[in-house]
Amino acid sequence: MFRTLLKSKIHRVAVTHCELHYEGSCAIDEDLLDAANIAENEQIHIWNINNGERFVTYAIKGERGSGMISVNGSAARRAAAGDLIIIAAFAQVHNDQVSAHEPQLVFVDDKNRQTELRHKVPTQRM
């Protein structure tokens, strides 16, 4: 049996551009793609913290070191420059490997530069 687990997350990254008439997808600074282990053309989920929108698209490379997060195509109607979003990718993990699985959790500063990399979501407490 396989389970779908969180593989990668870029947490609270700011949208820098929205390009309605671009071909589609989400352009992500290549440094962040590498840190999160997200491949070009990989399916990603985007959760907009500002407005609650949730949608699925795919990742393309943005200029390395630029901090670029460009929401493109029809998805551009679901975000605005300055919105904080979470970008996530999932993987099918065999049941035997679930306990050993560690996601890549990337945290950024206000310029979308990586500040921290974690491999575990902390337990939520009251």
From Swiss-Prot:
The keyword Chaperone does not apply. GO terms for cellular component: cytosol. Its cofactor is pyruvate. HAMAP family: PanD. It is found in: Cytoplasm. Gene3D superfamilies: 2.40.40.20. Heterooctamer of four alpha and four beta subunits. The gene is panD2. Is synthesized initially as an inactive proenzyme, which is activated by self-cleavage at a specific serine bond to produce a beta-subunit with a hydroxyl group at its C-terminus and an alpha-subunit with a pyruvoyl group at its N-terminus. Its EC number is 4.1.1.11. Belongs to the PanD family. The modification Pyruvic acid (Ser) is found at S25. Pathway: Cofactor biosynthesis; (R)-pantothenate biosynthesis; beta-alanine from L-aspartate: step 1/1. Binds 1 pyruvoyl group covalently per subunit. It comes from the Bacteria. GO terms for molecular function: aspartate 1-decarboxylase activity. It catalyses: L-aspartate + H(+) = beta-alanine + CO2. The active site is at S25 (schiff-base intermediate with substrate), Y58 (proton donor). It is an enzyme of class 4 (lyase). This is Aspartate 1-decarboxylase 2. Keywords: Autocatalytic cleavage, Cytoplasm, Decarboxylase, Lyase, Pantothenate biosynthesis, Pyruvate, Schiff base, Zymogen. Coiled coil: none annotated. It comes from Polaromonas sp. (strain JS666 / ATCC BAA-500). Substrate binds at T57, G73, S74, A75. GO terms for biological process: alanine biosynthetic process; pantothenate biosynthetic process. Its main location: cytoplasm.
